[in-house]
């Protein structure tokens, strides 16, 4: 989904401000864009609208961040959607995770026949209020029976992507996760759009 047009060419002369307070996200984004664009990081306490759409949430945060910073920003929102729960917790997964942790997320599926789920990530690049571009990455997989792995962050220990050779994101090396995660896929789409 794109509005307007934007120019972002790969070189250290071009920069974008990643708006996140999550060090794990920051590391993943910098690893994926390294050598293409200078990524600066700033933590802003942005209001997050309540919506079932990660596109809408990410867009709103990007426009708000741009209004504060007044230079190109990159903002991200993610969702973890359980088939058995009609897509919940979806974009609310951060708050679910903070309240009930990984074991609580797993328990949400007790009594259901399916553990299928998908993770999605939407990056919004905003160069002005008229230039807003969005890039999505998605991974299908399943919610495991017990948390597995020590790496990653957030819900990485409960989601086993179909592409993950039987491992959760928390069990993978960073290089592997950065190749198949929804965040990585969204960044690949961003790089392709800008010919990076």
Curated annotation (Swiss-Prot):
Gene3D superfamilies, per database record: 3.90.950.10
Cofactors that this protein relies on: Mg(2+); Mn(2+)
Homology family: Belongs to the HAM1 NTPase family.
Main location: cytoplasm
Origin species: Trypanosoma cruzi (strain CL Brener)
Statement: the UniProt record of this protein carries the keyword Manganese: yes
GO cellular component terms listed in the entry, alphabetical order: cytoplasm
Cofactor note: Binds 1 divalent metal cation per subunit; can use either Mg(2+) or Mn(2+).
Protein name: Inosine triphosphate pyrophosphatase 2
Subcellular compartments: Cytoplasm
Family matches, as HAMAP family: HAM1_NTPase
SUPFAM superfamilies with a match to the protein in the record: ITPase-like
UniProt keyword list: Cytoplasm, Hydrolase, Magnesium, Manganese, Metal-binding, Nucleotide metabolism, Nucleotide-binding
EC number(s) stated in the UniProt entry for this protein: 3.6.1.66
Function field: Pyrophosphatase that hydrolyzes non-canonical purine nucleotides such as inosine triphosphate (ITP), deoxyinosine triphosphate (dITP) or xanthosine 5'-triphosphate (XTP) to their respective monophosphate derivatives. The enzyme does not distinguish between the deoxy- and ribose forms. Probably excludes non-canonical purines from RNA and DNA precursor pools, thus preventing their incorporation into RNA and DNA and avoiding chromosomal lesions.
PANTHER family associated with the record: INOSINE TRIPHOSPHATE PYROPHOSPHATASE, INOSINE TRIPHOSPHATE PYROPHOSPHATASE/HAM1 PROTEIN
Binding site for ITP: 20-25, 61, 77-78, 94, 153-156, 177, 182-183
Reaction equations catalysed: ITP + H2O = IMP + diphosphate + H(+); dITP + H2O = dIMP + diphosphate + H(+); XTP + H2O = XMP + diphosphate + H(+)
């Amino acid at each position: 989904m794109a509005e307007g047009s934007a120019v972002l060419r790969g070189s250290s002369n071009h920069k974008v401000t990643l708006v996140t307070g999550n060090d794990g996200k920051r590391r993943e984004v910098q690893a994926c864009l390294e050598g293409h664009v200078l990524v600066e990081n700033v933590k802003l306490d942005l209001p997050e609208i309540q919506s079932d759409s990660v596109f809408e949430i990410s867009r709103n945060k990007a426009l708000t961040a741009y209004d504060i910073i007044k230079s190109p920003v990159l903002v991200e929102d993610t969702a973890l959607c359980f088939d058995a729960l009609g897509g919940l917790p979806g974009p609310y997964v951060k708050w679910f995770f903070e309240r009930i942790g990984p074991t609580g997320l797993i328990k949400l599926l007790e009594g259901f026949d399916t553990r299928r789920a998908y993770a999605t990530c939407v990056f919004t690049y905003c160069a002005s209020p008229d230039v807003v571009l969005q890039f999505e990455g998605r991974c299908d997989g399943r919610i495991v029976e017990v948390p597995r792995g020590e790496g990653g962050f957030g819900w990485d220990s409960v989601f086993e992507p179909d592409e993950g050779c039987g491992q959760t994101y928390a069990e993978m090396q960073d290089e592997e996760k950065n190749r198949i995660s929804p965040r990585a896929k969204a960044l690949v789409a961003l790089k392709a759009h800008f010919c990076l």
